[in-house]
C-alpha cells in the first residue's frame, strides 16, 4: 500500500496543507488566508484560534480532495512561521493573548536596553542570535508583563508557551503533548545551541519561568498522535521544523556550503555549515539547520522581513495592482533600470542591518514615474536585499555558491528570478516542486517513518525545473546595487 505524508505549513499569511506521495510529489493541497492585526505602529498579531481553525480546515480539505481515506496518511509533519509567540491556558488550550508575530517590533526599546546593559555578547554566544524584537523571548516576556495575572499564572504552572508548531501539536493531540523541535527552539533566544537545552542564564535574563517551555525533540521524532476525531484517523506526527529549516531540507541542501533562499512574506537565506556552528562577524544568525538522531547540523542565516509582503502592500495597501501576478508584466514593460528604489522597511530592517526603527521610503521619483516603475522597484527590493545577505556571507569568508536554490511563492515570477541572478552574479535554480517548506517537513516525517533510509535518498528526489544565468554586465550590476545601498543608508535610524 502506498504511503502518503500530510505536511502542515502554517505561514504568516495563510495556513496550508499538502499531501505528498513517498516520491515527494504533491497529491492534494488546500490553503486559507487569515486575518492580520496591526493594533499599533510596528505591532503585528494573529489570532491563535484562527490559526488553529484554518489549519484544521485545510487538513480536512486536502484529505477530502485527495480521494484518500484518512488511514492512508501514514504521518504528519508540521512546519511553521518561526518566532511567533503564543501563550495558552494549560487546561483549556485557549490563548491568553493574540499571537505576537515575528515581524512585531513592540519590544524594540526593551531590546535596546538589554544591549546597552552589555548583555548581547552572552546572548549571542549561547544562542547564535542577536538581541532583537524578532525573536520569541522578549515577546513572551511582554505577554507575561502586560496580560493581567499572566506572570502569577505562569509561576503556578497554569500556562504554556510555544511557537506555532508547539501550539498546533498541543491542539492536534488534544492537549496531551507539549513539545517542539530543535530548529524552532533555536529561534526563541532562550535555547543554547551548543548544549541543545533551554538555558537557565537566558531564562533569568528575560525572567521566564521554565515551566512554560516545551520539551525539545529532534526534527524527526515521535511527537504524538493527532486525535482521530479531528482528521478521521489517529495519525502520528513524526516531523517538525521551522519553515526555513524545512525548506533547507526540501531543497536537499545537505552538504556544507549549499545555500537556499526562500521568498514568502519575508526572505530567508540559509547556508549549511555542517556540524560546527559558525559565528558571523556581519550580523548574520547562527542557527540549528536540523537535528537528526541527536546530531546537529548548523546553518548561517540572513533574515529579511519584507519580500512577498512588499507585493502584498502594493496590492492591498496602496492598490497599485489587483493581483500579485500582475507585477511580472509591469516589470517586463519597465526593465531593470527604472531609476526608482523602494526600501520596504515597514517593520524595520532585518539582516545585516538589524535596525528596528528604520522605516520604508521610495527614492528617485520624477514626473515620469508611474505605477509600473514603483511596482518594479518593489520587486527589485527583494533581490537587492538578497544581495545584502550574500555580501555578508562573503565577508564572513564563505565561498560564493555555485548556485542559489530558491523556493516560495515569489519564485514563480520569472522576471524576479532573472533580476535576482543578474544582481547577485550567481546562477539561480528553481526546483520542480517549489513548495519546498512543506516538502521538507514531509521528508522529515518520512525519515522517521522509515520511508527514506537517509538524507541521500531524499536528495535523489530533488530536480531542477529552470536555471537562470546572470546576463547583466558587472558595471551595470554594481551601479544598480550602489543606488540601493545609498537608499538604505537614507532610511537607517542611525543615519
UniProtKB/Swiss-Prot annotation:
Under PANTHER family, the record lists:
GLYCEROL KINASE (PTHR10196:SF78), SUGAR KINASE (PTHR10196)
What PROSITE patterns does this protein map onto? FGGY_KINASES_1 (PS00933)
Q: Which UniProt keywords apply?
A: ATP-binding, Glycerol metabolism, Kinase, Nucleotide-binding, Transferase
This chain's source organism reads Ectopseudomonas mendocina (strain ymp) (Pseudomonas mendocina)
- GO terms assigned for molecular function: ATP binding; glycerol kinase activity
- Which residues make up the binding site for sn-glycerol 3-phosphate? 12, 82-83, 134, 243
Q: Does the keyword Protease apply?
A: no
- According to the UniProt record, what class of enzyme is this? transferase
Catalysed reactions, semicolon-separated = glycerol + ATP = sn-glycerol 3-phosphate + ADP + H(+)
GO CC annotations on file: cytosol
- Residue positions binding glycerol: 82-83, 134, 243-244
| Pathway field | Polyol metabolism; glycerol degradation via glycerol kinase pathway; sn-glycerol 3-phosphate from glycerol: step 1/1
Q: Quick one: which residues bind ADP?
A: 12, 16, 265, 308, 409, 413
Q: What is its EC number?
A: 2.7.1.30
Give the source lineage, highest ranks first. Answer: Bacteria, Pseudomonadati, Pseudomonadota, Gammaproteobacteria, Pseudomonadales
Name the residues that bind ATP. 12-14, 265, 308, 312, 409
Sequence similarity = Belongs to the FGGY kinase family.
Its activity is regulated as follows: Inhibited by fructose 1,6-bisphosphate (FBP).
Please describe what this protein does.
Key enzyme in the regulation of glycerol uptake and metabolism. Catalyzes the phosphorylation of glycerol to yield sn-glycerol 3-phosphate.
Xref: HAMAP family: Glycerol_kin
Q: Does the keyword ATP-binding apply?
A: yes
Biological process (GO) annotations?
glycerol catabolic process; glycerol metabolic process; glycerol-3-phosphate metabolic process
- A single Pfam family it belongs to is FGGY_C
Q: What is this protein called?
A: Glycerol kinase
Amino acid at each position: 500500500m502506498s504511503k502518503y505524508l500530510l505536511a502542515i505549513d502554517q505561514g504568516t499569511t495563510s495556513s496550508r496543507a499538502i499531501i505528498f506521495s513517498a516520491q515527494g510529489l504533491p497529491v492534494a493541497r488546500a490553503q486559507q488566508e487569515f486575518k492580520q492585526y496591526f493594533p499599533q505602529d510596528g505591532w503585528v498579531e494573529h489570532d491563535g484560534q484562527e490559526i488553529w481553525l484554518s489549519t484544521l480546515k485545510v487538513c480536512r480539505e486536502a484529505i477530502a480532495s485527495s480521494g484518500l481515506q484518512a488511514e492512508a496518511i501514514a504521518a504528519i509533519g508540521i512546519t511553521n512561521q518561526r518566532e511567533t509567540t503564543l501563550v495558552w491556558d494549560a487546561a483549556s488550550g485557549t490563548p491568553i493573548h493574540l499571537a505576537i508575530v515575528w515581524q512585531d517590533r513592540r519590544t524594540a526599546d526593551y531590546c535596546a536596553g538589554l544591549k546597552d546593559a552589555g548583555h548581547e555578547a552572552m546572548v549571542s554566544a549561547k544562542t547564535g542570535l542577536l538581541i532583537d524584537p524578532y525573536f520569541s523571548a522578549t515577546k513572551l516576556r511582554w505577554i507575561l508583563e502586560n496580560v493581567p495575572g499572566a506572570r502569577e499564572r505562569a509561576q503556578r504552572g497554569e500556562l504554556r508557551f510555544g511557537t506555532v508548531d508547539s501550539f498546533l501539536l498541543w491542539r492536534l493531540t488534544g492537549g496531551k503533548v507539549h513539545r517542539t523541535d530543535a530548529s524552532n527552539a533555536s529561534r526563541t533566544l532562550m535555547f543554547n545551541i551548543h548544549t541543545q537545552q533551554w538555558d537557565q542564564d537566558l531564562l533569568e535574563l528575560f525572567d521566564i519561568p521554565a515551566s512554560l517551555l516545551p520539551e525539545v525533540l529532534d526534527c524527526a521524532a515521535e511527537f504524538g498522535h493527532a486525535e482521530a476525531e479531528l482528521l478521521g484517523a489517529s495519525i502520528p506526527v513524526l516531523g517538525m521544523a521551522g519553515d526555513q529549516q524545512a525548506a533547507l531540507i526540501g531543497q536537499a541542501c545537505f552538504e556544507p556550503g549549499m545555500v537556499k533562499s526562500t521568498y514568502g512574506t519575508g526572505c530567508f537565506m540559509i547556508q549549511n555549515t555542517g556540524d560546527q556552528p559558525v559565528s558571523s562577524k556581519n550580523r548574520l544568525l547562527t542557527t540549528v539547520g536540523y537535528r537528526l538522531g541527536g546530531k546537529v547540523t548548523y546553518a548561517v542565516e540572513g533574515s529579511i522581513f519584507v519580500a512577498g509582503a512588499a507585493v502584498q502592500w502594493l496590492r492591498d495597501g496602496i492598490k497599485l495592482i489587483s493581483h500579485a501576478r500582475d507585477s511580472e508584466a509591469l516589470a517586463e514593460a519597465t526593465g531593470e533600470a527604472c531609476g526608482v528604489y523602494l526600501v520596504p522597511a515597514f517593520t524595520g530592517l532585518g539582516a545585516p542591518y538589524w535596525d528596528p526603527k528604520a522605516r520604508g521610503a521610495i527614492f528617485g521619483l520624477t514626473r515620469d514615474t508611474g505605477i509600473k516603475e514603483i511596482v518594479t522597484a518593489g520587486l527589485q527590493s527583494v533581490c537587492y536585499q538578497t544581495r545584502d545577505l550574500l555580501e555578508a556571507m562573503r565577508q564572513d569568508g564563505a565561498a560564493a555558491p555555485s548556485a542559489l536554490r530558491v523556493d516560495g511563492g515569489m519564485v514563480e515570477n520569472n522576471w524576479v528570478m532573472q533580476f535576482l541572478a543578474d544582481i547577485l552574479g550567481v546562477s539561480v535554480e528553481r526546483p520542480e516542486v517549489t513548495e519546498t517548506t512543506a516538502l521538507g517537513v514531509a521528508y522529515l516525517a518520512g525519515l522517521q517513518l522509515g520511508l527514506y533510509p537517509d538524507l541521500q535518498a531524499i536528495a535523489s528526489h530533488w530536480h531542477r525545473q529552470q536555471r537562470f544565468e546572470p546576463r547583466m554586465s558587472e558595471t551595470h550590476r554594481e551601479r544598480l546595487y550602489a543606488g540601493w545601498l545609498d537608499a538604505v543608508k537614507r532610511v537607517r535610524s542611525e543615519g
